Amino acid sequence: MEIYLVRHTSVDIPAGYAYGQTDVPLRPSFEDEAEAVKKNLSGHTFDKVWSSPLTRCTRLAAYCGYPDAEKEDRIKEISFGEWEMKSWDELSSDPRSEAWFNDWINVPAPSGESLQDQYTRVSHFLNEIRESDLQKVCIFAHG
């Protein structure tokens, strides 16, 4: 089985923010970046194409010729919960952040996820694909 993983293009938010599952805008360079991705995918035929439902992924999938890519919640970016769109500096003053910064792999953000939570949901999705009869798939997601 061949799995093509495609990361979304650059987002248009200041550096240093936990944006996770927030549907943030894309940079004005979207078309140039997307054109490079489209060129790399040209000539490939996929048995199935999925996309994270976040616009930064669905827009790229559509640009590359897959406007009907199946939206899959399990491949969303990690959820920072209450910390979505907060700066890392701002988070460092939150008393709950110490436990998270010390063990973000296992400790979830408030009302959000740990890295292990994200890994578990994404791996369940990927295992389903592996167990299918599909030979060549493409997934538009996050990095």
Region spans (language model):
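Histidine-centered catalytic micro-motifs
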Residues: 5-9, 140-143
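Active-site-proximal alpha-helix that buttresses catalytic centers in soluble enzyme cores
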Residues: 6-67
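Generic hydrophobic alpha-helical segments
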Residues: 37, 41, 118-129
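A glycine-biased structural micro-motif
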Residues: 43, 85, 134-135
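Short beta-strand scaffold positions
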Residues: 51-52, 120, 140-141
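Absolute protein N-terminus
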Residues: 1-2
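Active-site-adjacent alpha-helix immediately C-terminal to a catalytic or transition-state-stabilizing loop
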Residues: 58, 66, 123-143
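Phosphate-handling substructures
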Residues: 64-123
